[in-house]
Amino acid sequence: MEFSHYSVMLKECIDALDIKPNGIYVDCTAGGGGHSEAILERLDSGKLISLDQDDEAIETCKKRLARFGERSIIVKSNFSELERVLNELEIVHIDGVLMDLGVSSHQLDTPSRGFSYNSDAELDMRMNPRSPFSAYDVVNTYSEQELKKIIFDYGEERFAPQIARKIVLAREENPIKTTLELASIIKNAIPVGAAKKESQHPAKRTFQAIRIEVNHELDVITPAIETAVSRMNIGGRIAIMTFHSLEDRIVKTKYNDYAKACTCPANFPVCVCGNKAKLKVITKKPIIANNEELNENARSRSAKLRVAEKI
């Protein structure tokens, strides 16, 4: 199946990178190749490394970016392995990094991938289809306490205890195998009055939590930022697009940490730490999609783009 993905805030992302025609850039989440293509179109002698862990995305990118020849380097990898990828390519310094942390529209809209609570499929939710660990394993093997924790922490779901209890009770009868089966269990766990007040599907937050757990989505952000900052040339830009508050909080905090100079306690009369700021935060407030884009793609509504520059 052809991998399709709407490139959220395409112009904003490309402008944020302040691309140098001879620079070396990394698109950490290539998806359908939209952002990668736009970056390559601004390069002359420069190169772009496009990463993705999805086989279908890789094949789509190879076709879409073939016209750029050797300037396009496509690697099947999670961006948490950015350090290893750069080492294997013998690339020491880079000029910019783009990360789109959203689940691709292709993955969401392909029922067999098991991401959607609106279509019936086997419980899966793996961004890397070759990973041995899926949503089925989380739902059917995690303890009630573990389920409650991830649903509350990653889904910010206030009914996490009730949902975890219902899941455990249901799987005692039979393993929970499909997305609609799980969605029904979640719906029945939430009080009717509370569900009626919600504008979104009652399973949305729990599905998000399980997806994050399956793909270790939050765990990989910090090391990727650290690698990007350490490898970027002065003046290089890092642009990260997030789609929920947990991701955004990590990115904002990490940027601000790198933007700090002295980290000594406030009561120290002089600086003894010797720490120097490594980043200048370009976006004091995140960039969000404009109304025109929101009309084209409702999923852009939750996107936040934060940009920083190496100093």
Predicted regions, residues:
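S-adenosyl-L-methionine-dependent methyltransferase catalytic core, i.e., the SAM/SAH-binding region
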Residues: M1-I311
